């Protein structure tokens, strides 16, 4: 028997997935930034000071970033749903996403290029 998930359970699963993705992205970006910082340091005395200049992301920062990303995803989903309903459709189409991104022509063009591929 298939168990129906409640909206709260689905939201919790989505938030968990967002947390994992955001945490991995932050970790990778910090590693890149710290490696770039270490590569620009040339003397040993600077290397000692460089360890003090390592960038870190606190759990609070990551949690707040997750909240921001999650809320943006919820807003995006609501906007897509509204554009779809306005066009009397039940299925979201690329044109709905282009309507959401209409104020960011660079992003819109990038999405159109991805669609053509």
Swiss-Prot record:
<dbReference type="GO" id="GO:0000712">
    <property type="term" value="P:resolution of meiotic recombination intermediates"/>
</dbReference>
<dbReference type="GO" id="GO:0071821">
    <property type="term" value="C:FANCM-MHF complex"/>
</dbReference>
<comment type="function">
    <text>dsDNA-binding component of a FANCM-MHF complex involved in DNA damage repair and genome maintenance. FANCM-MHF promotes gene conversion at blocked replication forks, probably by reversal of the stalled fork. Component of the kinetochore, a multiprotein complex that assembles on centromeric DNA and attaches chromosomes to spindle microtubules, mediating chromosome segregation and sister chromatid segregation during meiosis and mitosis. Component of the inner kinetochore constitutive centromere-associated network (CCAN), which serves as a structural platform for outer kinetochore assembly.</text>
</comment>
<keyword id="KW-0227">DNA damage</keyword>
<comment type="subunit">
    <text>The MHF histone-fold complex is a heterotetramer of 2 MHF1-MHF2 heterodimers. Together with MPH1/FANCM, forms the FANCM-MHF complex. Component of the inner kinetochore constitutive centromere-associated network (CCAN).</text>
</comment>
<dbReference type="GO" id="GO:0003677">
    <property type="term" value="F:DNA binding"/>
</dbReference>
<comment type="similarity">
    <text>Belongs to the TAF9 family. CENP-S/MHF1 subfamily.</text>
</comment>
<dbReference type="GO" id="GO:0031297">
    <property type="term" value="P:replication fork processing"/>
</dbReference>
<dbReference type="GO" id="GO:0003682">
    <property type="term" value="F:chromatin binding"/>
</dbReference>
<dbReference type="GO" id="GO:0006281">
    <property type="term" value="P:DNA repair"/>
</dbReference>
<dbReference type="GO" id="GO:0046982">
    <property type="term" value="F:protein heterodimerization activity"/>
</dbReference>
<protein>
    <recommendedName>
        <fullName>Inner kinetochore subunit MHF1</fullName>
    </recommendedName>
</protein>
<dbReference type="InterPro" id="IPR029003">
    <property type="entry name" value="CENP-S/Mhf1"/>
</dbReference>
<keyword id="KW-0238">DNA-binding</keyword>
<dbReference type="InterPro" id="IPR009072">
    <property type="entry name" value="Histone-fold"/>
</dbReference>
<keyword id="KW-0234">DNA repair</keyword>
<dbReference type="Pfam" id="PF15630">
    <property type="entry name" value="CENP-S"/>
</dbReference>
